[in-house]
Each structure stands twice: as structure tokens, then as C-alpha cells.
Amino acid sequence: MQTLTIIRPDDMHLHLRDGDALKAVVPYTARQMGRAVIMPNLKPPVVSVADALAYKARIMAALPEGSAFEPLMTLYLTDNATSELVREAKAAGIVAFKLYPAGATTNSDSGVTDLFKLIPVLEEMAKQGILFLVHGEVTDPEIDIFDREAAFIGRVMKPVLAQVPNLKVVFEHITTAEAARLVLEAGDNVAATVTPQHLLLNRNDLLVGGVRPHHFCLPVLKRETHRQALVAAVTGEKAHKFFLGTDSAPHAKSAKENACGCAGMFSAMTAVELYAEVFEKAGALDKLEAFASKNGARFYGIPENAGTITLVKQSQTVPASVPYGDGELVPMRAGGEIGWTVQY
């Protein structure tokens, strides 16, 4: 039977929620990943060092006994951010600030209204070596939802990179050929995370044969040509600029199967297996380890994980749902097969 052993991966973009939801989902990530970059869009958001340290303590308390998993904490960038906050964050071990343009995604109401007013704060991030994580979509109601990432590149990303050229930027969960091209053409201070859904699915998977609420995420799934461009980027000659970030975003089944359903796909349960499928289909299984376990650590300036995990070429059926607080959670590819299984 075919096996593949790789350095234990890191998830460089993860939503863990809080309370009972946190307790329900964190074990799935902790058994596959050594570390994860934890998104700060709680209600209320994680905006201060004290907020982040308290949230980290709650995550650690929710981990299975004996787990060596390490959460890497971030702060939610707001219009009120200061250079002093950046220095405090650096001193406390916070790895990054996350940009949510106001209204772009789940719990983004406190997000930034005008990033260009925060240029001195971004300059301090560059000076301190704190990363800037970007949800790269404009929120202008005039812009078609399928074009919001491409519009963000010209309106925001390129001007910011021109004004703060040494800022370390992660273009999060990229979904378009335009975003891949920006990262490929930018300096080594710009990288990107890519989710399993944007490497495996396109907008037909959301809209053909009925609306598929469990395939609804933001940024929304795009055309097949964009999916192919992402696969080419993560397996190509500049693949070192791209790394694993699931954007696994749990919402109760009742909140997804709804007249106004929530955006987000829960992939943490079988994340590594889903990515293995992508790389196998692309004839690039030899590049999975760098994407999952090396590129992100290098960009963040942290050592690779010490342990390994082993994937077996053995099919598994993903459960239709799993418990989630008082309700249930529908994982990515619920009820379907994945051709790989992580050995635990």
C-alpha cells in the first residue's frame, strides 16, 4: 500500500471559534497540525494583546490531553490600531495582524474602513517583523462578488506594497488567477495561503443542480480557469510562495442550511488528505510536504515542526455530520470519499 510521510504540517489560516464550538473543533486540527495561525474574528473581535492571550489560554484548555499543538495568535486590525499596539503585540509573541475590510466576511463589522490611513501602523509592522494577513476583497456594493478579489489587487494591494515595500504580506485564501499572478510577480515579502476548496472546487460546485450551502465560502468559489491557475501556482516553479491555510470555518448545519446561510467550509477534519488529493491529481505529490510543512514556517520565520505524519493511500468516507455544541457540523465532502487517510 502506498504511504507518504511528511513533516507535521501547519495550518496558516484557521478559525476555531470559542466556547463549546472551540471545544468541538480544535481536536481535529490538533491531531493533524503542529501549529495553526488563529483568526481573530470572534464576537467581539480579538483586538488587544490581552484579548489574544486570553483566547490562547482558552484554546490550550480545550486541547486533548497530551497534545503538543501550538496556536499562533493574531490581532484583528481596526481603524484604531496604533504603532504602539504593534510593538506590544511583537513583545507578546503575536505573529500577525489580520485585515478584514469592513463587511467583507463573517464578523468583519469592526474591520478597516480606510487602510491608507493606517500606513504608519503598517510601517511599524514592517519594522517589527510582524506579518500582515489580508482578506483581499473590496466591499464596494457596485463591484460584482466574483470580481472583488481582482478589484482589491489594483485598488489596495499594489498601492500598499508600493508605499510599504518591505512589509511581509500574506494574501489569504487566494481564489483567482490575478491573485496568484500578483504573488508570483511580487518580491519574497509577499506570499499566499490557498484553501482545499479553492484547489478542488469551482463555482459550478456551488450553483449547479441546486444551491450547495456547504460549498458557500468567502471569497466565493470562482471559475474553473481560476482553480486551475491556483493548482499551477502551488505546484509550479515559485511554489515556495504558497502554503497551506485551510480557512476551515465551522458553522452549525442550521446556520448553513438557511435562507441567509453563513459563509465558510469546515475542512479541518480531513485537511491534509484533501490537499494530498490535489497534489496527486496534479502529479506533484513530491511537492505536498513543502506546501504543507515548510513554506509557511519559512515565511513566518519559525522552525519546521519536529514530528511527522503519515498518509496512506486508503479510501475513507467522510461523516455526514459531526457534533457541534448543541447542533451538528457538516464537514467538507460530507458523505463522500477521499482517497487518502492520515494514520493516527
From Swiss-Prot:
**EC number(s) per entry:** 3.5.2.3
Q: What does the record give as the active site?
A: D247
InterPro entries to which the protein is assigned, alphabetical: Amidohydro-rel, DHOdimr, Dihydroorotase_CS, Metal_Hydrolase
Which pathway does the UniProt entry assign to this protein?
Pyrimidine metabolism; UMP biosynthesis via de novo pathway; (S)-dihydroorotate from bicarbonate: step 3/3
Modification N6-carboxylysine occurs at: K98
Task: Report the domain of life of the source organism.
Answer: Bacteria
Hydrolase keyword on record: yes
Name the positions where substrate binds: H15, L16, R17, N41, H135, L218, H251, A263
Query: Which coenzymes or cofactors are required?
Result: Zn(2+)
Q: Which GO terms describe its cellular component?
A: cytoplasm
Q: Which catalysed reactions does the entry list for this protein?
A: (S)-dihydroorotate + H2O = N-carbamoyl-L-aspartate + H(+)
Chain sites annotated for binding Zn(2+) 2: K98, H135, H173
The answer to whether the entry has keyword Lyase is no
Query: Residues that bind Zn(2+) 1, according to the entry?
Result: H13, H15, K98, D247
Ordered alphabetically, the record's keywords are:
Hydrolase, Metal-binding, Pyrimidine biosynthesis, Zinc
**One biological process term in Gene Ontology:** 'de novo' UMP biosynthetic process
Q: Which GO terms describe its molecular function?
A: dihydroorotase activity; zinc ion binding
Bound how, and how many: what does the cofactor note say? Binds 2 Zn(2+) ions per subunit.
Similarity comment text for this entry:
Belongs to the metallo-dependent hydrolases superfamily. DHOase family. Class II DHOase subfamily.
The record's subunit annotation is: Homodimer.
- What function does the entry list? Catalyzes the reversible cyclization of carbamoyl aspartate to dihydroorotate.
Protein name per UniProt:
Dihydroorotase
Organism per entry? Neisseria meningitidis serogroup C (strain 053442)
Q: What is the lineage of its organism?
A: Bacteria, Pseudomonadati, Pseudomonadota, Betaproteobacteria, Neisseriales
